Amino acid sequence: MSAKRTLTWRAGGWVIAGAVLVTLAVLGFALVGPLSGVRPVGDGRDPATYGFDLSGLILPREGLAASGNPRDFLAALDSPAVMPGSDMVQHNAKRRGKYVVTGDRVIGVFIGGVARAYPLRLMNVHEVCNDEIAGVPIAVTYSPLTDSAVVFDRRVGDRVITLGVSGLLYNSNTLYYDRGGEGHVPSLWSQLAFRAIAGPQSGTPLEPIPGVSVSNWGTWLTTHPQTQVVLPAESDERRMKSTSYERYWRDGRVDFPVVRLAPPPAERTTPIGTVSLRTGALFDQVMPPMTFVMAVRRADDWVVVPLPEIVRLCLPPTGFAETSGLGAPITWRAAPDLGAVIVSPPPNPVVIPCRWFAWDAFHPAPDGGSGEPAGAPAAASPTGP
């Protein structure tokens, strides 16, 4: 007779325990609505169940998808607390786990002489932060599936809107909605189309803030020593530890529908092979879909700078790269695989950091152009479903 075997923590019990904890966490989120008497809006599968008027959708319906989560499953972060970035070492020393360290990625914003960092580990669990810097009401938006960061001015006409997470995606990119009181009819706002795509505000643009960077905390702090950093709420701590998209980007697989649009000329991207840098040419090849790029707005079009090219140019002894032909000279300081900080003084152009497949879907070159991502779908008219 064989001896009895006991499952120990080292022998694999940790796997079962981990699975149980994950299951309990999922059940906990699922039961929050029923136990609180609030029914979640959106079934995770059908966009029509999310409570938005889709009848006037101005983009092809094929690119619209439910994320799997209901509306507001990820709660917007409103008017967050901040602290001086120079105090982060002391702040980390007082915590059981460190909040932000040198290699952690952040969204860096510089407005009216004020620098502020929004750690991506925090933005992963909120996807939008309604904030104000130097008197400017802003929405810091981050879409993890497309790794895209856009900071918008929240002033729309005579209103200041406040954004929430809709639970819907377009071209794998987060759709937001404008929150309001009883009787308010919300619109859906696309991060990478820079406008409302459905609802009463359909077609209304949101203006991106210039000079936004995505890089690591160490580089941002070095180039902006007076920066502030946004702090999490206590309820964010556990979710921040368990949320990461690194493996998704490495796999290179896009899990949601993507429709290549056909926007007006001013919203298209000039083929990257025709744009040169001061010390070298941009990649003139088919880029992998998950290549991290910086899209730079010019007067009549956009140009794209791949992060690997900026990194290549940021050689010793200075560690900086200067680019030209992008509407305005830009000086960058890059961190390999993490991003690049804009260090040239204002005014700087609008720069959108994101993954190439997403940018090319929303803002393709007029003829497909150089740099077309592998397996890119055919362009579709944005005139309606």
Residue ranges and their predicted role:
Residues M1-A11:
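N-terminal Lys/Arg-rich, disordered targeting/topogenic segments
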Residues W9-P385:
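Mid-to-C-terminal functional-domain signal that highlights helix-capping/loop sites
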